[in-house]
């Protein structure tokens, strides 16, 4: 169904839509599990399969619709947001939402029909199913005792709830953050930097050693390199993941160690960014001001020194370098006049001899060649050799340049950068494995605040800019998802209290559990784990919906609030555990994924699995406690028989 919807709206099969389909495996079975379990429960109470299926479907129309719309609504803010996240995850979000909606329709139609045909009376007492049911019945009674005792100590329970919720903030603030996990893309790059006045022949003397470092790796499949006079670019394409033992991150570190031994060059080892548009360097920190370039360079060099001293960088440097030697020919106009040399003619002669300009063409054997006059290379290697050049003087006589000109040598920047029409310098860096991009940027921001005077601003470029801009969108998207879910549930329950009970009793606790693992270093806060956190809101809300919906019905049948919620939680214990187990097992392959693309899958898998396990356990105790505190008391509903007499509705008997 999801693939059909993708075809209808023009989505493509790509890594993110495939990830959505993998995630949907653990999501779409939930509604069917709840329906089939409810049919089985009615059969155990003595009803025939067909009436049991009809009754179960009627009971669960509301909860399943609420669960389906809730989970689908979670993905709406993801799909409609702009920027990089919106561009990447639009198809992902709507593919998952479509799969969830289809699963809800199937759960209300196909699932009860199949349950009425395939489930039989007495099956739950025989064989392995009977053994499992007896063990679960014992566990259900134990849970009932635990819940009953827990509700007697609600102040302690609410204190624990407040502590767990408060942990969300330190877990989130002190977790490593990056735009996306580093991925093994089977390539390691090397950026080669030579001195500003280096020639191509000089650079080639050393770039062969760069090639040799890459070629020495057993994991190497092919090596490429492009060399220019002042640097170059190269890299190694590795063998497939199955044919090597080391990741590209490990090879990056080994390559950096090998490059450090090469004289005459500076080679920066790096891996490509995990997302498009990130630029060459993960750290790209911009300082902008109206100040002179030399002052910008001084402050940038101070920050580079702080970066190396912090131990967070494999490489750091600024792109504003005052290392370009420049020789200026200064003419003495008085001497020019005394020797009868025309200034424009002297300049033209110098341009012809040194500039290498095209002046004409000639043909040989039908082929055309350019005429480029220039003195021999050996005679123009150093600025001092300019003094031996002759230019045309009076009466076409040659006059030595040294008789009327002097050389002035200076050092200038290779180039000057602008950022938003201001003079700017960029500090670019590479971080080692185990250090997050946010940690490196935070360090630079902190040091810049101490070093830079007024009139200087900091900004970002490349992957660093993406992290800062996309990272700020998460809280807004998360809040919008929460508001949408609350409004959907409020409309479904016709109450503002019930949605609060559902969300307060499940979502903060699941978020705390999911953020525990980034806090411990098992993963990072990135766009994939953020998508997992938003998905988690819809998933754990399902458990609260089942409990609150059934507790309200039991109150209408005459139960008091405490007994109603205990019976509701006990009755819905099995589907809650089954849906949690299905979701966890469906996402477990993401947790243990290896190879290309494993970083993204690990991140979203760890977030969902940890959040579902911890959130579901807490939900079984905190939702009933908050229900007792917040839920309104529902009056007993009396029905009228065909004679117009009031009758009491039949109570659902559940062994507690």
Task: Give short role names for the model-derived ranges.
Residues 11-12, 78-88, 158, 162-198, ...:
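Transmembrane helices with small-residue packing motifs
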Residues 114-125, 179-187, 225-230, 266-289, ...:
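Flexible hinge/switch segments at interdomain interfaces of large molecular machines
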Residues 1, 25-35, 39, 60-80, ...:
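Transmembrane alpha-helices and their membrane-interface boundaries in multi-pass membrane transporters
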Residues 60, 128-179, 236, 261, ...:
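Signature of alpha-helical transmembrane segments and their immediate interfacial
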Residues 36, 268, 297, 304-481, ...:
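Extracytoplasmic/periplasmic membrane-proximal domains and adjacent transmembrane bundles
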Residues 1-41, 48, 80, 98, ...:
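Hydrophobic transmembrane alpha-helices and their membrane-interface caps
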Residues 10, 53-65, 85-97, 139-154, ...:
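Alpha-helical membrane-interface segments at transmembrane helix boundaries
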Residues 189, 201-279, 304-305, 334-356:
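Solvent-exposed, membrane-proximal periplasmic/extracellular interface segments of envelope transport
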């Amino acid at each position: 169904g999801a693939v059909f919807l993708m075809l209808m709206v023009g989505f493509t099969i790509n890594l993110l839509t495939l990830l959505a389909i993998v995630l949907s495996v653990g999501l779409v079975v939930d509604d069917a599990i709840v329906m089939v379990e409810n049919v089985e429960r009615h059969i155990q109470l003595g009803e025939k399969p067909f009436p049991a299926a009809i009754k179960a479907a009627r009971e669960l129309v509301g909860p399943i619709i609420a669960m389906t719309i809730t989970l689908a609504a979670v993905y709406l803010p993801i799909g409609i947001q702009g920027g990089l996240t919106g561009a990447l995850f639009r198809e992902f979000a709507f593919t998952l939402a479509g799969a969830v909606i289809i699963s809800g329709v199937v759960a209300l139609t196909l699932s009860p029909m199949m349950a009425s045909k395939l489930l039989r009376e007495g099956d739950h007492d025989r064989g392995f199913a009977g053994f499992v049911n007896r063990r679960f019945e014992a566990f259900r009674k134990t849970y009932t005792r635990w819940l009953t005792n827990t509700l007697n100590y609600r102040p302690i329970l609410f204190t624990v709830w407040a502590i767990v919720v408060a942990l969300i903030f330190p877990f989130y603030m002190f977790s490593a953050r990056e735009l996306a996990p580093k991925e093994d893309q089977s390539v390691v790059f090397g950026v080669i930097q030579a001195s500003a006045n280096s020639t191509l022949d000089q650079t080639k003397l050393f770039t062969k050693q760069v090639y040799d470092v890459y070629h020495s790796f057993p994991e190497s499949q092919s090596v490429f390199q492009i060399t220019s006079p002042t640097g170059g670019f190269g890299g190694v394409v590795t063998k497939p993941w199955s044919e090597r033992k080391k990741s590209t991150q490990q090879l990056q570190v080994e390559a950096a160690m090998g490059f450090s031994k090469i004289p005459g060059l500076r080679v920066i080892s790096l891996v490509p960014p995990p997302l498009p548009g990130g630029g060459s360097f993960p750290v790209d920190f911009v300082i902008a001001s109206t100040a002179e370039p030399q002052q910008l360079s001084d402050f940038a060099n101070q920050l580079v020194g702080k970066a190396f001293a912090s131990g967070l960088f494999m490489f750091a440097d600024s792109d504003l370098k005052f290392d370009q030697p420049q020789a200026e020919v200064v003419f003495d106009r008085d001497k020019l006049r005394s020797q009868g040399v025309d200034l424009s003619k002297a300049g033209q002669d110098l341009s012809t001899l040194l500039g290498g300009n095209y002046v004409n063409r000639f043909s040989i054997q039908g082929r055309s060649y350019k005429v480029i006059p220039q003195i021999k290379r050996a005679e123009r290697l150093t600025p001092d050799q300019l003094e031996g050049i002759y230019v045309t003087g009076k009466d076409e006589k040659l006059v030595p340049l040294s008789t009327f000109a002097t050389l002035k040598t200076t050092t200038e920047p290779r180039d000057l950068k602008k950022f938003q029409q201001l003079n700017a310098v960029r500090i670019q860096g590479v971080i080692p494995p185990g250090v997050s991009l946010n940690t490196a940027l935070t360090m630079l921001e902190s040091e810049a605040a101490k070093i830079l005077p007024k009139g200087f601003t900091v900004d970002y470029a490349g992957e660093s800019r993406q992290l800062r801009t996309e990272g700020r969108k998460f809280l807004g998207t998360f809040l919008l998802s929460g508001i949408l879910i609350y409004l959907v549930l409020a409309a479904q329950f016709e109450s503002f209290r019930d949605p609060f009970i559902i969300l307060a009793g499940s979502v903060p606790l699941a978020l705390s559990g999911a953020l525990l693992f980034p806090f411990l270093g098992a993963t990072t806060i990135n766009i994939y784990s953020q998508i997992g956190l938003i998905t988690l809101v819809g998933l754990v809300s399902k458990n609260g919906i089942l409990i609150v919906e059934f507790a309200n019905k039991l109150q209408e049948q005459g139960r008091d609030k405490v007994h109603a919620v205990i019976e509701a939680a006990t009755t819905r214990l099995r589907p809650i555990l089954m849906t949690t187990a299905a979701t966890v097992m469906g996402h477990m392959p993401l947790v243990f994924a290896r190879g290309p693309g494993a970083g993204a899958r690990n991140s979203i898998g760890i977030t969902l699995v940890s959040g579902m396990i911890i959130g579901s356990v807490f939900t079984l105790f905190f939702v009933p406690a908050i229900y007792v505190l917040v839920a309104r008391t529902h009056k007993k509903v009396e029905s009228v028989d065909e004679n117009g007499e009031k009758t009491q509705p039949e109570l659902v008997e559940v062994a507690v």
